[in-house]
């Protein structure tokens, strides 16, 4: 609720970094204006974390990346609430908390570094140096793990499963959702959380007004489940989980 969010405005900020592609979110001033236009500035202070630079943090899995490049303002925080909109994605197949912690926390050049699986950090040349699909997905998992290692156990993960389009919010003309909203899931394990959301999508029985087939096809065509499989393999978390449902009257 917006009023409750406003009340938290002094204790939390909405953070992300500039994009590695064109548009209003690639430049800090325009990015802040876009956040204001969409109402984010009304509920929290907005921090573009790479507005004043970037720094590198170590990665455990060095198959593709030597380090992770994140916004300099990450140093200002000692915990993180990773709040993601779970949906499809043109490149990753789907986007959840792992992608949010990887691409979302990376600076613009860090995004280029992940998308190219370590080939370049040059934003102007990344689209000519895109990695193979699995290498890209594995790089996302590795960089998400780097951020998890940076914060330790001080991260809460939340996926909001509404407006379940096959396309990401970064798409200027996303496809209209063909599925009904599912709910909000939270965990201290990002791998378990994304896996649970995937399972809920796959479990839908297609019916009029609630067709999961386009989203499943998007995930399958991009080999999207490899992200959680590889994330588990490198030790970011576990795909095993227990789903506990909270009814509205139980919510605090």
Predicted feature descriptions by range:
Residues 10-252:
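Extended, low-polarity segments enriched in aliphatic/aromatic residues
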